[in-house]
Curated annotation (Swiss-Prot):
<dbReference type="InterPro" id="IPR003382">
    <property type="entry name" value="Flavoprotein"/>
</dbReference>
<keyword id="KW-0808">Transferase</keyword>
<comment type="similarity">
    <text>Belongs to the UbiX/PAD1 family.</text>
</comment>
<dbReference type="GO" id="GO:0106141">
    <property type="term" value="F:flavin prenyltransferase activity"/>
</dbReference>
<dbReference type="InterPro" id="IPR036551">
    <property type="entry name" value="Flavin_trans-like"/>
</dbReference>
<feature type="binding site">
    <location>
        <position position="119"/>
    </location>
    <ligand>
        <name>FMN</name>
    </ligand>
</feature>
<protein>
    <recommendedName>
        <fullName>Flavin prenyltransferase UbiX</fullName>
        <ecNumber>2.5.1.129</ecNumber>
    </recommendedName>
</protein>
<dbReference type="Pfam" id="PF02441">
    <property type="entry name" value="Flavoprotein"/>
</dbReference>
<keyword id="KW-0285">Flavoprotein</keyword>
<keyword id="KW-0288">FMN</keyword>
<dbReference type="InterPro" id="IPR004507">
    <property type="entry name" value="UbiX-like"/>
</dbReference>
<feature type="binding site">
    <location>
        <position position="33"/>
    </location>
    <ligand>
        <name>FMN</name>
    </ligand>
</feature>
<feature type="binding site">
    <location>
        <begin position="84"/>
        <end position="87"/>
    </location>
    <ligand>
        <name>FMN</name>
    </ligand>
</feature>
<keyword id="KW-0637">Prenyltransferase</keyword>
<feature type="binding site">
    <location>
        <position position="165"/>
    </location>
    <ligand>
        <name>dimethylallyl phosphate</name>
    </ligand>
</feature>
<comment type="function">
    <text>Flavin prenyltransferase that catalyzes the synthesis of the prenylated FMN cofactor (prenyl-FMN) for 4-hydroxy-3-polyprenylbenzoic acid decarboxylase UbiD. The prenyltransferase is metal-independent and links a dimethylallyl moiety from dimethylallyl monophosphate (DMAP) to the flavin N5 and C6 atoms of FMN.</text>
</comment>
<feature type="binding site">
    <location>
        <position position="149"/>
    </location>
    <ligand>
        <name>dimethylallyl phosphate</name>
    </ligand>
</feature>
């Protein structure tokens, strides 16, 4: 399975790391935004080199010659995790000024699965309208909202819950959580 992963500058880097760790064995294409590089320094015990090592292919966010910027490059899904509100707003407005937003535009125009994982809260009416617009256009909006029916004992358990749901959405089997 070919999966494009964008890490934007929102809080929630542990979700991205755990997601990539669970995609081993799949063909992954990673883009880390400039803002995400800064957030990684604040939020993660992992460095950028480790995160990049989890992906099969890595691209800079300004590399418009990357294959994922073209509709002729076939991939199964794109996941932006975490997805900043700025990135959601750009995608909703059709702004493709970074590789992440360009690959998202490709996903939309080619009718490929696009999943955005916002972590922000509270949300403004504008944020909600942008997410609604994306959802109406086929994007899966999967907020990083852990469920508590699994009785998490740690932050890692809560991260596992969200990542398990994202993996389910892209069709990657996992046993990160106890299922009903």
């Amino acid at each position: 399975m070919r999966i494009v992963v964008g890490i934007s500058g929102a809080s929630g880097i542990p979700y991205a790391v755990r997601f990539l760790e669970n995609l081993r064995g799949h063909d992954t294409y990673l883009v880390i935004s400039e803002a995400a590089k800064k957030v990684i320094q604040y939020e993660s015990d992992e460095n950028i080199e480790y995160i990049r090592s989890l992906a099969s292919h890595n691209y800079e966010d300004d590399d418009f010659s990357a294959p994922i910027s073209s509709g002729s490059f076939l991939f199964d899904s794109m996941v932006i995790v975490p997805c900043s509100i700025t990135t959601i707003s750009k995608i909703a407005a059709g702004i493709s000024d970074t590789l992440i937003t360009r690959a998202a535009a490709v996903s939309l125009k080619e009718r490929r699965r696009l999943i955005v994982v916002p972590r922000e809260m509270p949300l403004s009416t504008i944020d909600l309208k942008n997410m609604t617009y994306l959802s109406e256009n086929g994007v899966i909006v999967a907020p990083a909202s852990p469920g508590f029916y699994t009785k998490p004992k740690s932050v890692d358990d809560m991260v596992a819950f969200v990542v398990s749901r994202i993996l389910d959405l892209v069709g990657v089997g996992n046993d990160l959580i106890k299922r009903w």
